Amino acid sequence: MSTADAPKKPRETDDVPVPATLRKSLKNRHIQLIALGGAIGTGLFYGSSESIALAGPSILLAYLVGGFAIFMIVRALSEMSVEDPKAGAFSYYATRYWSKRAGFISGWNYWFNYILVSMVELSVVGKFVNYWFPAIPTWVSAAVFLVIICAANLLGVSKFGEFEFWFAIIKIVAVIAMIVGGLAVIIFALPTASGIKASFANWFALEGGFFPNGLMEQTKDGTWTGLLMALVVVMFSFGGTELIGITAGETEDPRRTIPRATNDIIWRILVFYIGALGVIMAVIPWNTIGGDDVPSPFVQIFDSVGIHAAAGILNFVCLTAVMSVYNSGLYANSRMLYSLAKQGNAPAYLGKLNAKGVPVAGVLTSAVITAIAVVVVFVWPEFAFNYLMSIATIAGIINWTMIMFTEMKFRKVVAAGGAPEDSELAGKSGKEALDAIHFKLPFAKVTPWVVLAFLALVVVLMCFSASYRVAVIAGVIWLAILFAAYQITQAKR
């Protein structure tokens, strides 16, 4: 048979009936925007009001410190993803380089974390819808958007990538437009609703200056405020950046794409968090940010200068941001369940794919459980955001802790000559193997311990807040459940 007559290898797209496997259909532009979309959502557009109230202008330092920590966490994960790109990312890596127990705990905790994050997103959807239509119950909005995003995730990974790409584009354009608009208000001294001239000097002009609540201080009603307490809210905002690792198994060229997306994180933090909030606090006095009538400081900045149409547009952007994070969350959860099933740590049906390479059972299972948020929003609307966010934060910290420990285990295995057979590190050991790692974690002997110490500090700080204290207790109970569940599943085998 001639070369011309030889059957061509099917191309991995969602429209070609190739054998059921995860498709490597995500391109560089998808990965770049997915990484951005997963981290810019409720924490920035909605939760930033709370963090500003806690720390005032010094919140900018909190985002800088927290951003550095999360950047190093993603660098650690990306080090492994580049060498061994697999679906399930750190659950697979924890199993491969640490232990089966670690993989079980890491995978199920990540799934639990993103279930909670998804619930948080759904719990605030109604607030943005109510900006235009105050009569619509918040639980109705949550239910409608849950169905829409679930349907999008069933279309195939390339379709998911396109959805997320455009969601993220909307957010990027909007935040940049907000920054430019805010700078115009400052430069041209446009009048504001507060009557205070817009200026970066406002960071220092109000009572208390740049650190109005200090590093940490207790108010008369017993609550704690200050820069350190704001770190807790800040870390929730950064949840989702590790999604880069989850996408590695469905990325066309992970060795080129993953490092580029990872290194761009630091610029996203500087522009989209520090830059945006810095401009907002220059235009709006920080102690007037927030309130039930205006659900986000990003909306409030345009309301403050009388541009109500732009405020409505920003409210739409906030809504798409929430949908984007839930879209990413449902994607990540379905892939994690798929990976857990392939490892034997979840029911086998969750490891099955349809003809388009979509883990349908994982998508539907995660969506149904996330639907609990609709009930929570209906029954306890005020409870929903704060408590769900606090529990999601502790679950996220557990994830990040597992990633850092797994990275150290990964290096030990690689140094001992245990690199994957299909890796360029195969056959190498010791310093030669470690030097051959393509995308190294900077200062790898020290960085994991510095990050772990920082995460431990955040957990200690959580104990000073009533709602977060509940989350810490819930986190301990959740870990105990995971340990017990692993032992039970092993005993049955």
Feature map (PLM): residue ranges:
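Membrane-interface "cap" regions at the ends of multi-pass membrane proteins
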Residues: 1-48, 53-55, 70-75, 84-87, ...
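Helix-loop-helix connectors at the membrane interface of multi-pass transporters/channels
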Residues: 91-96, 101, 121-142, 174-177, ...
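Helix-loop-helix junctions that connect adjacent transmembrane segments
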Residues: 17-22, 59, 137, 169-312
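Extracellular loop-to-transmembrane helix junctions
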Residues: 22-23, 46-141, 145, 265-274, ...
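A generic transmembrane alpha-helix motif of multi-pass inner-membrane proteins
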Residues: 186, 384-399, 441-493
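TM-loop-TM module centered on a large, flexible mid-protein loop between adjacent transmembrane helices
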Residues: 92-94, 99, 131, 205, ...
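C-terminal membrane-solvent junction of multi-pass transporters and transport-like membrane proteins
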Residues: 166-167, 349-360, 400-467
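Membrane-helix boundary/coupling elements in multi-pass transport proteins
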Residues: 86, 109-124, 233-251, 308-348, ...
